[in-house]
Amino acid sequence: MIGNSSKDNFGQQQKLSRGLKNRHIQLMAIGGAIGTGLFLGSGKSIHFAGPSILFAYLITGVFCFFIMRSLGELLLSNAGYHSFVDFVRDYLGNMAAFITGWTYWFCWISLAMADLTAVGIYTQYWLPDVPQWLPGLLALIILLIMNLATVKLFGELEFWFALIKVIAILALIVTGILLIAKGFSAASGPASLNNLWSHGGMFPNGWHGFILSFQMVVFAFVGIELVGLTAGETENPQKVIPKAINQIPVRILLFYVGALFVIMCIYPWNVLNPNESPFVQVFSAVGIVVAASLINFVVLTSAASAANSALFSTSRMVYSLAKDHHAPGLLKKLTSSNVPSNALFFSSIAILIGVSLNYLMPEQVFTLITSVSTICFIFIWGITVICHLKYRKTRQHEAKANKFKMPFYPLSNYLTLAFLAFILVILALANDTRIALFVTPVWFVLLIILYKVQTRRGHKVK
């Protein structure tokens, strides 16, 4: 059994539990790529790009697949790799590992802040008198308790969360196909394939609108790399991880492109309200009375799922950082069930602070945090691709023996890095995201200072 190890106060060797099974990983690979970016953000993306949003999802999906293939090849090249920190330290050094580890932690902490705030907003749909902070707080407590139990319970939670999302999207696609086949007619006109090009063409807002849509499209894919982080806790990583990664293209075509294709065939893109979920609008058009409540429930569980994934991934990252002396040793303590309890409490406190900030100034903080988070994820993805390039160049013997290889290397690596740089340029074009490009460097400067201070103290101790 492979796992990160540490010693408890009694000097006994402990390891992270491998409690995740194949079905957990396969559905987590889907669930990690389905969230508020698709359920809510797709309305804004369609508003910018029109039907060409389908191409934006396809293009982004290709590069996300390349990122996942490079991540998978790295993780499977060395049984000692269990997270980003492990291979970044190996190829880029301790400082890069320190920055990467804490940045990935911050990525998911910021997402959890937004998701738990969203849980409160969605709950108010049914219970408008309930304070917005209360459902988020209760959700955090419940998720913390469940994550403290066992790794297997986390897997079960994500399995059912992801299953709800999958069923909702499949129901939309099947319903949409039936409506198109029967020529269903709404107030905006009949459901037809012609809706894709009869309202200004595939690129109704030109290349400018198409390019601006990538901001929200990339955000919709944030978290797709979580399947890689779980590599250290799968029962058979050599078999499970490649299968999960290789199925990503099919899932992107079905759950992203397929769902939006059906939506825009039923409703012309220019009729959809960008401030509402297109999923809710389509189900409402069908005449299902409880459609809004059904989708609201799905979106709520989606937010809870993202928060659950955040709590899991950040605790494992903090545990790994503590094991490598990049965080206080107290954070690497494991329970009798081999769960990093102190790391879970640490991440929960950080998320709780974010819930309070989102309550005090929800609109400003949400936009800023999600934009900064997106930039940080781009950093993580870029570092992964760079590490893969160095692995191929410096470990050629290991690379030849690795059966799970990055396709079209090294062209795919360089194209992916160029795409990520392109997304940063897009973020600079939009007024509501430009500020994130100025704020994010502060985070990296802070980490560099902390690393230097920690290293200096370490030398003094020695």
UniProtKB/Swiss-Prot annotation:
Pfam families: AA_permease. The chain crosses the membrane at residues 27-47, 48-68, 96-116, 134-154, 160-180, 209-229, 252-272, 279-299, 343-363, 366-386, 410-430, 435-455. Its main location: membrane. One of its GO terms (biological process) is amino acid transport. It is found in: Cell membrane. It is a multi-pass membrane protein. One of its GO terms (cellular component) is plasma membrane. Coiled coil: none annotated. The keyword Transport applies. Signal peptide: none annotated. Belongs to the amino acid-polyamine-organocation (APC) superfamily. Probable amino-acid or metabolite transport protein. This is Amino-acid permease AapA. It comes from Bacillus subtilis (strain 168). The gene is aapA.
